[in-house]
Amino acid sequence: MSRNTEKAQSSLNRFQALKNKEAGVLESNPNFRPKYVQSVDSLPQAEKWRSTIIGEISVKLTKIQDPALNEYQIRDINDSLNKLFNEKRSWEYHIKNLGGADYMHFNKDFNNAGKLSQLDSSGSHIKGYRYFGRAKELPDVKEVLMLQQKKGHANKSKHAKELEQNRLLNEQDQRIKADYYGVYDEINDGNDDIIASNERDIINQVNEVLGDEIIKPVDDINEYYVAHKAQGVDNLIEFEKNRGKKLFRKFKNNQHNDEADSNVITNFEKEVPTSDEVTKWIVNKKRAELIARLGINK
């Protein structure tokens, strides 16, 4: 009799599940949650499965704090929590692909933002694995967490030292100006009479100390150059002109010889034709070409 009752209840349950599916009622039984999120095409159903996972995570996070649990139970619950968090992330990716909300980046825009943020940030990470509640108090886990904490403090201390060094360097740059490096040493500061003197006074002071006129003023040197050296430059130019004329005469005399000196310079003294002369030459040339083409005799 009981067997028939169970069959009737089972049939009734299947019938009720079919009716709920036809009516659009969402499934919430964790036992019927699909293993692969891609098998769900309905966005509301995917949202429902994500909500059920969040509920399971909350229950297990409370349970893992129980002081009566032994080490094996703690590790088992911690493994379940890691699997549930991975599954929740998979549903969040799938919801985004179905055109739903982006829970991974915009949790603050939803009603359960505080709860989600607390869940996602809970636990301690060690090489991609998370430890929750009493799992962080396990001997091996506690040792690794302490090493990570020391490393984090060392990195923070190093960063703080770098910031302090940068601050000191900035203060030094503000205090130490270009005059510290001797950039303005030659500018008169009112303390050095030699720097304040003009060029001739400095030369006179040097000659007075040495006893003889060792250094001549720049003006005297320039005057000497203008008076003596400039005349030499004029003589050089005159020599080059005479030399060019001689070479040109030599070239004219050797024009009829077979062996011509390739190093002889041509007449560079010849004047360059003016624009009027060039224009006249072009007109005459065009006129001659036109007469030759038409066959006109002069």
From Swiss-Prot:
It comes from the Eukaryota. It is found in: Cytoplasm; Nucleus. GO terms for cellular component: cytoplasm; spliceosomal complex. Keywords: Cytoplasm, mRNA processing, mRNA splicing, Nucleus, Spliceosome. GO terms for biological process: generation of catalytic spliceosome for second transesterification step. Transmembrane segments: none annotated. Its main location: cytoplasm. Associated with the spliceosome. Belongs to the ISY1 family. Involved in pre-mRNA splicing. This is Pre-mRNA-splicing factor ISY1. It comes from Debaryomyces hansenii (strain ATCC 36239 / CBS 767 / BCRC 21394 / JCM 1990 / NBRC 0083 / IGC 2968) (Yeast). The lineage of its organism: Eukaryota, Fungi, Dikarya, Ascomycota, Saccharomycotina.
